[in-house]
Amino acid sequence: MATIRCARPVLQTSHRLFQSHNQRRTFLPNPFAAASDASSTPQTLTAHRTLSFPSAPIYSIIADVPSYASFLPYCQRSDITHWSAPDKTYGRRWPSEGVLSSGFGGITESFKSRVYCVPGKYVESVGGDTETSLSRDEIAHHLEDAGVGSRRSGDNVLLKHLRSKWTIEELGKNKTGVSLALEFAFTNPFYAALSGGVAPKVADVMIRAFEQRVVALLKENPAMVTASLADLDGSRLKR
């Protein structure tokens, strides 16, 4: 009797060995792809503190830009190159333009900033082509010198957009709210990538440093606690 042999069926796999040309996968992803988006669009970081001191000395300490390099992390130098005209309320001159040197994420850069102080309320600094968010009436004492108002800090290599804005709000006799909003955009993805691990922490680090300085100065100099802005000169009483 003849033996009947059946051919073994061919097993078909459900796995596709090839993908269509429309489903191409990037073999080597661009490490700067995300950073490129971050460098072109300004990022905003915020931080807030409530301090148990009057608002006047807190504001004066925050507006004391020449002292930043002595206590502020990442700030290596802070020089004021122009001062405002005396404001109409306190007769004080305020920082109006400065050169700050900062370093973080392996990058060190010096850049010009225009500074705008609304006594007792705001301290704002802007760099590059960034415009102030404050009204002309609020910063009239900064605009009396037309040359300052028209200056642009377009020579910054590190940042193409920069705005830091301190808001000081009196919440009670010895209670003050302090808020910091920091906007920045790097000039290219390389800088954004290098600073990626550090940049998100900057606002909180800055406001913590100011908080510590306020507490230290006012405990060492109790007379500053009750002083008005007219009696203060930066981080000390007028002599």
Positions of the model-derived regions?
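Intrinsic-disorder/low-complexity, polar/charged segments enriched in Ser/Thr/Lys/Arg/Asp/Glu/Gln
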Residues: 42-48, 95, 110, 161-163, ...
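A conserved amphipathic terminal alpha-helix motif
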Residues: 192-231
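Structured catalytic core of nucleotide-sugar glycosyltransferases
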Residues: 41-47, 113, 228-239
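Hydrophobic ligand-binding cavity/cleft-lining segments
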Residues: 2-94, 99
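Beta-strand/loop substructures that line and gate deep hydrophobic ligand-binding cavities in soluble
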Residues: 127-205
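Glycine-rich portal/gate segments that line the openings of hydrophobic small-molecule binding cavities
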Residues: 81-153, 236-238
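Hydrophobic pocket/interface hotspot
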Residues: 58-59, 68, 115, 180, ...
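Alpha-helical membrane-targeting segments
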Residues: 3-14, 103-109, 185-205
